[in-house]
Amino acid sequence: MPDMQKRPDHRRIPISKVGVKDISYPIVVMDKNRSLQHTVARVNMYVDLPHQFKGTHMSRFVEILNRHREQIALDKLETILEEMKARLGSASAHLEIQFPYFIDKRAPVSGARSLMEYSCEFSASLTDTLDFVLGVRVPLTSLCPCSRELAIHGAHNQRSIMTVRVRYRDFIWIEDLVELIEQCGSSPLYSLLKRVDEKYVTEQAYENPRFVEDMVREAYSRLAGMENITWFSVETENFESIHNHSAYAAVELDRRG
């Protein structure tokens, strides 16, 4: 049968990324307790396309994914990327995996246990060498220092999302990264709180007011102190409770030299 993708394209323009996006797929992730979490990810797969070809073979991406269906885990990403390059005749391959990850957390006073969900991502690219980025989105509470200073009865507070992405030399557990991030807001979030816990986290937030600027600077200071990390970016969005907009701040550090 005719292969339209291999036909020449007269415009002769190379494409940096082409492929399939937003595939829902089961994966396996090991947690810090050395147990396996089975979760469902959204997967994006791309390769570059040389200027002389009209199109890529979209079906091959899914075939590759299916072939590794029992092995889609962190230590298998480079193997998948190598196969993408080989099967699709490309110089570079890219794989993005976003998934929910659960951590067993205890309430701060009662000790009540519950699962807390965090949105995580693996982003991997392969040309000559592997480039891997770990990302986590962590919900926090932020309490406004200005409001606390001005108001007689309390201060406005809101939920915030801090997104941290890191490149590292040696393996970092998702749990350790989450724990670091949760120290950067006014208070962590919990899935389950009893009354004694609710009192504690409310007072903790009030005694630890943070602007969005404070939060990214705190994360920067903590991440910069980890020599294992070669690059990081931090973004924080505060979903303001007294405004019809969000507050936002971002920082980045690159030590790859």
Curated annotation (Swiss-Prot):
Keyword terms of this UniProt record: Hydrolase
Documented EC number(s): 3.5.4.16
Coiled coil ranges: none
Top EC class of this enzyme: hydrolase
Lineage: superkingdom: Bacteria
Site entry (May be catalytically important), positions: C144
GO MF, any single term: GTP cyclohydrolase I activity
Functional pathway: Cofactor biosynthesis; 7,8-dihydroneopterin triphosphate biosynthesis; 7,8-dihydroneopterin triphosphate from GTP: step 1/1
Catalytic activity: GTP + H2O = 7,8-dihydroneopterin 3'-triphosphate + formate + H(+)
Ranges annotated as spanning the membrane: none
Entry's Gene Ontology BP terms: tetrahydrofolate biosynthetic process
Function: Converts GTP to 7,8-dihydroneopterin triphosphate.
HAMAP family: GTP_cyclohydrol_B
Family per similarity comment: Belongs to the GTP cyclohydrolase IV family.
PANTHER family registered for this protein in UniProt: GTP CYCLOHYDROLASE MPTA (PTHR36445:SF1)
Name assigned to this protein: GTP cyclohydrolase FolE2
Gene label: folE2
